Amino acid sequence: MAEILLTSVINKSVEIAGNLLIQEGKRLYWLKEDIDWLQREMRHIRSYVDNAKAKEAGGDSRVKNLLKDIQELAGDVEDLLDDFLPKIQQSNKFNYCLKRSSFADEFAMEIEKIKRRVVDIDRIRKTYNIIDTDNNNDDCVLLDRRRLFLHADETEIIGLDDDFNMLQAKLLNQDLHYGVVSIVGMPGLGKTTLAKKLYRLIRDQFECSGLVYVSQQPRASEILLDIAKQIGLTEQKMKENLEDNLRSLLKIKRYVFLLDDIWDVEIWDDLKLVLPECDSKVGSRIIITSRNSNVGRYIGGESSLHALQPLESEKSFELFTKKIFNFDDNNSWANASPDLVNIGRNIVGRCGGIPLAIVVTAGMLRARERTEHAWNRVLESMGHKVQDGCAKVLALSYNDLPIASRPCFLYFGLYPEDHEIRAFDLINMWIAEKFIVVNSGNRREAEDLAEDVLNDLVSRNLIQLAKRTYNGRISSCRIHDLLHSLCVDLAKESNFFHTAHDAFGDPGNVARLRRITFYSDNVMIEFFRSNPKLEKLRVLFCFAKDPSIFSHMAYFDFKLLHTLVVVMSQSFQAYVTIPSKFGNMTCLRYLRLEGNICGKLPNSIVKLTRLETIDIDRRSLIQPPSGVWESKHLRHLCYRDYGQACNSCFSISSFYPNIYSLHPNNLQTLMWIPDKFFEPRLLHRLINLRKLGILGVSNSTVKMLSIFSPVLKALEVLKLSFSSDPSEQIKLSSYPHIAKLHLNVNRTMALNSQSFPPNLIKLTLANFTVDRYILAVLKTFPKLRKLKMFICKYNEEKMDLSGEANGYSFPQLEVLHIHSPNGLSEVTCTDDVSMPKLKKLLLTGFHCRISLSERLKKLSK
């Protein structure tokens, strides 16, 4: 934790020094010198923290107090800087003379106290012979590792082939008396990976299917609702009598369900009242995974058990080899010395045959030189046996991370287990916390540097890739439950963050909380009712169902809060009153509201001059305040619904931006802003805008976007929703960087070859009129990988997706989805050369004849 706090202090001191230099110039040279001194000293202390931690781990108990002193010092300095920066900005706003202001004198006095503490710490570390390692690995530029995992197989089952074949045969055996298969074993053996691969292979042979993560604190009602949604139970039946309606449907269906990670039998006692027995008469199946054999035995009986075992040595080394070299090659070790191979085998041996430990260790070694010396150091750090399963291996991989990446990894522990986390959220929260900063001379954006960190974590196999974007970048990710536990344990030990269950206790400890996450309504409300002192709180995560969370927040100022995330999971829409005290969160940089809620952000939000991200989920009807544009640090304003609901969020004329009050250099995302509140000529000022979504697009906006020289040179994603048919022809061919385009119109709108950017990767057309000429244009796009056409009218009776005379027919297309086309009598594609790289074909809502080649028929199943 000490090194994390020190890094945060260094980054914040860089920011403050920059602000002083820009805003106050030479008048405050003495104050800037103090800030620069802080930065230098914190870097110096950080350089020997790792050495001190190694001595502590080696049994030198005297160092423990030194590390505690360093952590307290770093925390106090961070508090001082967080308190100081808003005062600089406020003073500059009202043209006060900062040099004569009282808070500047107070700051100077606090710096003197810190100097005395730094002298004491440096004296003690010399006494204990703690070496300055000058380790600046956090400042190194992480390589973009995207190429290492873009095409990786996400369902590796190396060493589990026999298990897979045996279970597949069992699940498809029509004579199976009781259709439950229980995959059990210790954490990290690959139970979930194996179960998912089985489930995905056989689910098409059943009438309905569902995959549910159960977890340590399950709720039967939520699990049943999840199953009901996946099998297509109507919304009315889910609301009226979920249990009875679900059971009635499943009685007449042949189903397969995967219930992942069941911890105890109580939850099964609740579920089995609704799930009909899986007997041989109907042929339904249930796959469960559990780390407890007794759970599997209770649910499916002795015959259901399939216990996974650690991998044998050769299979372990095969998995290690695949992960080290990133491809299957029997000659991978041909150029390696016999000693290096032997060290590699010894490293694998210390992993105890546990796939997760092997994969994580390989990820760590990939980031190092492939030399005997480098690998030997890892081997020596692993001890002589596997301790606590693979816990030591995982902790070693954490310590091997660059210092700047460690808090980014720990952030995954703030989310519930098995939560799918958007890369956009992680990246912008890391930036808000100043874990990621752009050094002078670096022309890349902070978001790009943060993405490098995320790529590195995935490359090291610490994080699991869940989804990719249209262009192959990370869209969302997950963390294995063992690594999630590691995050929580490390965070608690170092006071980086606390979960709700360990937040209660000594008031002094509660007052020092910097980050806290709640997964439970009851615990959260009880905690807030205890009236805790939370003056140092930086991050608050609330995963809840009770909308009263907002009223409880009204009793706290949270003056140092950087990040606020509220995720509401209730099924009904709830009106919430967001307290005006939100305006007191002067340090707030990141605000995310998600869930079925409606309300209004208070006007006091405009006082939050450091706000960088406002992210409102598609189910939330949260009205933005007037003046939100004026935050000069605003980078992302996201409203994720493009329907009428989103339009109603902007029903205040005062939202209309003053074009001269904008600070456009930072703005990167404007998503689903109604055109009526959007002045087209401000587009010229948004020079760094990467993503833009506009509702009710007007002729003037179309005209501005369609000029010969692109008005938004950095634009990568464009989403336009038209409420009427524009008279202007949209022309986007001059935008070379737009890779994702979404066009939605309610009436006829003409398109031609000039309508599209030349380098499209993903295109979505909704409610458009399409003819064979436009289709012929789309077939020629050299980079188009995903094409979706929803409720589009086709001007002719037959849509032919076959190759053109020139041979072109979607050369790079991987996904094609056509839904509810109007006016068609036939869709055909019978040749074998069209769409050669297609992986997924979805033809839904069709009421016409479909003629496909045998290859395409298989892809459409």
Swiss-Prot record:
The keyword 4Fe-4S does not apply. It comes from Solanum lycopersicum (Tomato). InterPro entries: AAA+_ATPase, Apaf_helical, Disease_R_plants, LRR_dom_sf, LRR_R13L4/SHOC2-like, NB-ARC, P-loop_NTPase, RX-like_CC. It is a peripheral membrane protein. Transgenic tobacco (cv. SR1) plants expressing Tm-2 exhibit resistance to tobacco mosaic virus (TMV) and tomato mosaic virus (ToMV), tobamoviruses that can multiply in tobacco (cv. SR1). The Tm-2, Tm-2(2) and Tm-2nv alleles present in the tomato mosaic virus (ToMV/TMV)-resistant tomato cv. Craigella isolates GCR236 (AC Q71BH0), cv. Craigella GCR267 (AC Q71BG9) and cv. Yukang 2 (AC Q5MLE9), respectively confers resistance to ToMV but not the tm-2 allele present in the ToMV-susceptible tomato cv. Craigella isolate GCR26 (AC Q71BH1). GO terms for cellular component: plasma membrane. (Microbial infection) Interacts with tobamoviruses mouvement protein at the plasma membrane; this interaction triggers defense responses leading to programmed cell death. This is ToMV resistance protein Tm-2(GCR236). It holds the Pfam family LRR_14. Keywords: ATP-binding, Cell membrane, Coiled coil, Host-virus interaction, Hypersensitive response, Leucine-rich repeat, Membrane, Nucleotide-binding, Plant defense, Repeat. ATP binds at residues 185-192. One of its GO terms (biological process) is defense response to virus. LRR repeats lie at residues 225-248, 305-327, 388-411, 449-472, 510-536, 585-608, 609-631, 652-680, 689-710, 712-735, 736-758, 784-810, 811-835. It is found in: Cell membrane. SUPFAM superfamilies: L domain-like (SSF52058), P-loop containing nucleoside triphosphate hydrolases (SSF52540). GO terms for molecular function: ADP binding; ATP binding; ATP hydrolysis activity. Inhibitor of viral mouvements which confers resistance to some tobamoviruses including tomato mosaic virus (ToMV) (e.g. isolates L, W3 and SL-1) and tobacco mosaic virus (TMV), but not to resistance-breaking isolates (e.g. B7, LT1, LII, Ltbl, ToMV2, and ToMV1-2) ToMV and tomato brown rugose fruit virus (ToBRFV). Elicits a hypersensitive reaction in response to avirulent (Avr) movement proteins from resistance inducing tobamoviruses (e.g. ToMV and TMV) strains, thus leading to programmed cell death.
